[in-house]
């Protein structure tokens, strides 16, 4: 646990990681849990850029500038927004990341936010699965809790 009350990558690595959104998405914790809220806020603040989400921020080694936003993480943030009752925000995250596919409709692993280019493995099955899961979740009627 990070001193700010959010989760961190590991006991030895205090950085935030977008994969830490999964406990809320999968229902392991309620979205109003203080740790979950702090983690979601940190992901938005530290990892989101121009509508895309990085998995985590890399250190200053030479390859860090070559890393792009991880498209799956943008779909995760859309799902978290929906779970938190922020349907309009969820739609924005979904549409922004859905639009980052190639001409054939295929997603890569990463997206270069600055150069507006697809990066990484093509096609990336995890991103396609995440996009489909997010589309299904966003199309479901709101739950009355």
Question: Which residue stretches match the model-derived regions?
Answer:
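Extended glycan-interaction surfaces of carbohydrate-active proteins
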Residues: 1-70, 92-126, 130-143
